Amino acid sequence: MPNTNSNSYTFAYAAVLTLIVAVALAAAATGLKPIQQQAIDLDKKRSILNAVTNLTDKQQILKDYAEKVTEVVIDQQGNAVEGVKAFDLVLKKAYKKSDSERRLPLYIYNAPEGKKYIVPMHGAGLWDEIWGYIALDQD
């Protein structure tokens, strides 16, 4: 039986316990990554749809987004850009690029009463950053 009152036993015990907890945390973080990404995507879709509707049900949000929202990426002149997914663009990073390289997402909501254009907004507020989505009716 080892001497549990020795310094070497205490350090070895702490090292083994730290290693076990580190492996458990790494496994949990890796295992939960897909679930976290799904939650982030759902929150973004909910935010986009909240500009035009007031949906709270997860299944209804996913259904409406898939059926009624068209994603478009535009350049500074308003021309559609192919090969880039609007949902994956990070607006904060896009604003830091030069005008010629800047690509911006635009979401088109196809409602029964007509199209609505959903534009993401991002900027500086009084205390922190302000971000959200603004919906515009088709004129």
Predicted feature locations:
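Flexible, solvent-exposed loop/hinge segments and secondary-structure transition points
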Residues: P2-D139
